[in-house]
Swiss-Prot record:
Function of the molecule: Catalyzes the attachment of isoleucine to tRNA(Ile). As IleRS can inadvertently accommodate and process structurally similar amino acids such as valine, to avoid such errors it has two additional distinct tRNA(Ile)-dependent editing activities. One activity is designated as 'pretransfer' editing and involves the hydrolysis of activated Val-AMP. The other activity is designated 'posttransfer' editing and involves deacylation of mischarged Val-tRNA(Ile).
Any one GO molecular-function label of the UniProt entry: zinc ion binding
Lineage: Bacteria, Pseudomonadati, Thermodesulfobacteriota, Desulfovibrionia, Desulfovibrionales
Gene this chain is encoded by: ileS
Top-level EC class as recorded in UniProt: ligase
Name of the featured protein: Isoleucine--tRNA ligase
Gene3D superfamilies: 1.10.730.20, HUPs, Ile-tRNA synthetase CP2 domain-like, Valyl/Leucyl/Isoleucyl-tRNA synthetase, editing domain
The EC number(s) this enzyme carries: 6.1.1.5
Length: 938
């Protein structure tokens, strides 16, 4: 027996079957670094213009987590795909370095020493801490295969950035949008600082619940409510914050609600009629009598008395009073609530909030001096009981604001702060108009979400009572407390920040005399004793001005950015602050499109939590599977929802990755001897090869459209389907015989090889943004004669992706053939199951087709026998089909007969032939194989 295996053109490539990603990826990272693959990518693009994805800066604190990995990989996919499409898309990574988390870490490290250290010394420690984690995170992001200007990031603590932030504050001042006033704001007693809306999280919290009556001794009660004795009249409120009762200044009722006077014993109590039943149940009053009804508007101006202080609490009107819970009469403390504050301004009430920064009552607060607010809660209830004004007491679990950093409950507290005014210069309306008209929101529900947040948000509190951040550039009069913040002066100070080695440390290190303009006098009192403002800017203002510090300043960027991409929580964070900062100073949004992704959750959809023990770290996945599998995970899911990750999910992706890799390996193996000179033009290719290229080209178009529309799960599924269904299960399966058995330089084989090369180059381009490591590895194994002369797969010019597509008629004919092939497989199956045949090559198939189908099959111009992978195939008229022919339910125009092929199996190609041994030198070969070996045929 001859060894004919050596005469076959078997696949040949050094591209390894086993990925070994954990070992090979670091090698590829070093290669990219050495070759400046990122620079090469950017230099090769630009034919289609520019594209700016502006990076939302992660916080420089701790190692990266799965949310970071998801975010950075998504951005990397976009940047790489845009460059490969011909857009010059550079990526400038950023870091957010100021703020409370770092300051608290440093505070913990320093302990008591911090109290005696100058501000600039503490700030130096904060800077060192941020630099440490910036470097750690940079290494971790690069390990993910993310391309970017890693040696030239933007950093919010760099002098140029701090100067830009201070300059933007000056721009707000110039337009009148920066104001200083006393208002209730979120306050964290633990961190001892004001908080922005974006720094508040809502968690369930159990609070005391009390119904309290306010004596209504006003003589006018008898006029408004005849028959009601003022000496025994009360108005009833309900609150879950008893500690705010010492600061009560009024009771609010709704002007359009009906209220009732309920007699119980000898006393009269006013509550809303719509809440009467709930109140009676809470008070546990079995016996009562409704003695009067009155509209809320008629109660305005009556003077109630505070339940335990000798001072009035007038009845006022407010539209925010509801009938959802309580009594319909609302305890009003203007120093502790936003709506209360607005009501207080309208009625001239005292904005009273006698608390220290740590949440203790001042000494002036009778009964509760020195107590924290939470210590005071039971004491206030005790006092109410003592004076006889507590009607009911209980506990309630409700959603309550907590500090994002320390996770402790926060309070509303009126303090003097700096604000960006939402109504000045029409900031709110301009922002709402921009949200509707100028920005594309992906997903579309993002528009409504941020619109609602902007529409109802209060003025933006931008001051923080901390040290690590950009100082609010202002002077305070020591004689009267008035603030001075001339816009030109503020911008001049900002320029000094830019020139100072450590930026805005200038504010802390420079003598007051060098900062205060000569001869400056207070515009309010005429005094000339000044001090520097010690408050710093909200870090959301810091990061929100990145468009001014980066997008407008870096030559590789351009304002406005094409895309901001972050997690869905950033509608209240970076998207929000950036929009207000840009609209407030430029009148336009800083972005054209905003894309949001969901949160990473475990395989059961649960939020990741250390206490639950379900946290998955990116490094764990990289160490086990490689970053490539993590990248594939990002591309495989619809990231606009919450994204699940588990070992089971990753194992499925490992299998999918293996199929894609094996397809690439097979393609590489079969083009090893192809050269540009031996390639076949598209028009001259075998029709099957043209169809395969059409399939790949259409997949390529769908993939490129998916990249453009940010639908990366479609990229993955299209690529995977191309490999598994169109190639492995169809085209490559058919092609093996032609590739292996044909003469090496035959037209049939060269046509197939050309198609495989074209398909591979399309695939490599389509894979590269997602499977970056593998695409580069595959590209490196493309035969040198065929490989484009570029240093990296990412430097392929956009013009190198021609489309090889068929016309609609030709495509329809091939799709019909696929349907016939599928039906024929069904017809063969009974013989395979019975053991009569082992493989489709053991069969002789006859297709009985109506005239239209027969013409379609015969008109394809390709070897039908090869496409059906049988040893013999005939096409006959449907009318000639025997009665026992297999009938297709899907194609009524088709019937099939299958029988065992006659003859013997060719030792070289395994096709069964009745004509073996036509050449005595090769008695076990079919005529085709004999012709190949003797050089007389293909």
């Amino acid at each position: 027996m001859s060894d004919y295996k050596k005469t076959l053109q078997l696949p040949e490539t050094k591209f390894p079957m086993k990925a070994n990603l954990t070992q090979r990826e670091p090698e590829m990272l070093r290669k990219w670094e050495k070759d400046d693959a990122y620079g090469a990518m950017v230099r090769a693009s630009g034919q289609q213009g520019t594209y700016v994805l502006h990076d939302g800066p992660p916080y420089a604190n701790g190692n990266i987590h799965m949310g970071h990995a998801l975010n950075k990989i998504l951005k990397d996919i976009i940047v790489k795909s845009r460059n490969l499409q011909g857009f010059k898309a550079e990526y400038v990574p950023g870091w957010d370095c100021h703020g409370l988390p770092i300051e608290l870490k440093v505070e913990h490290e320093l302990g008591e020493k911090k109290r005696t250290m100058p501000a600039h010394a503490v700030r130096k420690r904060c800077r060192q801490y941020a630099e440490k984690y910036l470097d750690i995170q940079r290494k971790e992001f690069k390990r993910l295969g993310v391309f970017g200007a890693w040696d030239k990031p933007y950093v919010t603590m760099h002098p140029s950035y701090e100067a830009a932030t201070a300059r933007e504050l000056g721009n707000f001042a110039a337009k009148g949008g920066l104001v200083r006033s006393k208002k209730p704001i979120y306050w964290c007693c633990s961190c001892q600082t004001a908080l922005a809306e974006a720094e508040v999280e809502y968690h369930d919290h159990t609070s005391p619940s009390v119904h309290v009556r306010f004596p209504l001794r006003d003589p006018r009660v008898a006029e408004v409510l005849p028959g009601v004795d003022p000496a025994h009249a009360y108005i009833v409120i309900w609150t879950t914050t008893p500690w705010t009762l010492p600061d009560n200044m009024a009771v609010a009722v709704h002007p359009d609600f009906d209220y009732v006077v309920v007699r119980h014993g000898g006393d009269f109590h006013i509550v809303a009629e719509g809440l009467l039943e709930a109140c009676l149940k809470a008070f546990k009053w079995d016996e009562h009598e409704v003695v009067a009804r009155i509209g809320g508007r008629a109660l305005e101006g009556l003077k109630a008395t505070h339940p335990f202080y000798d001072r009035p609490s007038p009845i006022v009107l407010a539209d925010y009073v509801t009938l959802e819970s309580g009594t319909g009469c609302v305890h009003t403390a203007p120093g502790h609530g936003r709506e209360d504050y607005e009501t207080g301004l309208r009625y001239g009430l005292d904005i009273y909030s006698p608390l220290t920064d740590e949440g203790r009552y001042l000494d002036c607060v009778e009964f509760f001096a020195g107590m924290t607010i939470f210590e005071a809660n039971p004491k206030v209830i005790e006092k109410l009981r003592e004076v006889g004004n507590l009607l009911a007491e209980g506990r309630i679990t409700h959603s309550y604001p907590h500090c994002w950093r320390c996770k402790k409950p926060v309070i509303f507290r009126a303090t003097t702060q700096w604000f960006i005014a939402m109504e000045r210069n029409d900031l709110r309306q301009k922002a709402l108009d921009a949200i509707r008209d100028d920005v594309r929101w992906i997903p579309s529900w993002g528009q409504e979400r941020i619109h609602n947040m902007i529409e109802f948000r209060p003025d933006w509190c931008i001051s923080r009572q901390r040290m690590w951040g950009v100082p609010i550039v202002a002077l305070l009069c020591e004689d009267c407390g008035e603030a001075w913040n001339d816009a030109d002066w503020m911008r001049d100070i900002a320029e000094r920040f830019a020139k100072h080695a450590t930026g805005c440390d200038y504010w802390y290190e420079t003598d007051l005399s060098d900062i205060v303009p000569a001869g400056l006098r207070c515009p309010k009192c005429g005094g000339d004793h000044w001090k520097k403002e010690t408050d710093i800017l909200d870090v959301w203002f810091d990061s929100g001005t990145s468009f001014a510090a980066v997008v407008e300043q870096r030559e590789e960027c351009g304002f406005p950015a094409d895309l901001y991409l972050e997690g869905s929580d950033q509608h209240r964070g970076w998207f929000h602050s950036s929009l207000l900062a840009s609209i407030g100073t430029r009148g336009v949004p800083p972005y054209r499109s905003v894309l949001t992704h969901g949160y990473v959750v475990d395989g059961d959809g649960r939020k990741m939590s250390k206490s639950v023990g379900n946290v998955v770290a990116p490094q764990e996945i990289i160490d086990k599977h490689g970053a490539e599998v993590l990248r594939l995970w990002v591309a495989s899911v619809d990231y606009r929802e919450d994204i699940r990750i588990s070992e089971e999910i990753l194992n499925r992706l490992v299998d999918a990755y293996r199929r894609i890799r094996n397809t690439c390996r097979y393609l590489l193996g079969n083009i090893s001897d192809l050269t540009p000179e031996t390639m076949v033009p598209f028009e001259a290719m075998d029709p099957l090869d043209r169809f395969a290229l059409d399939l790949a080209s259409r997949a390529h178009e769908r993939i490129q459209d998916a990249y453009t529309e940010y639908e990366f799960h479609k990229v993955f599924h299209t690529l995977h389907n191309l490999c598994v269904t169109d190639l492995s299960a169809f085209y490559l399966d058919i092609l093996k015989d032609r590739l292996y058995s044909s003469a090496a330089d035959s037209h049939a084989r060269r046509s197939a090889q050309t198609a495989l090369y074209r398909i591979l180059m399309l695939m490599v381009r389509d894979m590269a943004p997602v499977l970056s490591f593998t695409a580069e590895e595959v590209f490196g194994y493309v035969p040198a004669a065929l490989r484009p002369d570029v240093i990296s797969v990412f430097a392929l010019p956009a013009t190198d992706a021609p489309a090889f597509t068929l016309d609609t008629t030709s495509r329809a004919a091939w799709e019909k053939l696929l349907a016939v092939r599928s039906e024929t497989t069904k017809a063969i199956e009974p013989l395979r199951k019975s053991g009569e045949v082992g493989h489709s090559l053991d069969t002789h198939v006859t297709l009985f087709a109506d005239p239209s189908l027969k013409a379609t099959l015969e008109g394809l111009g390709s070897d039908l026998r090869a496409m059906f992978i049988v040893s013999r195939l005939e096409v006959m008229d449907l009318a000639d089909a025997p009665a026992d022919a297999w009938t297709s339910e899907e194609l009524p125009e088709l019937k099939v007969t299958v029988r065992k092929a006659e003859g013997e199996k060719c030792e070289r190609c395994w096709i069964i032939s009745a004509d073996l041994g036509t050449d005595a030198a090769h008695p076990t070969l079919c005529p085709r194989c004999t012709a190949v070996l003797t050089g007389t045929g293909a």
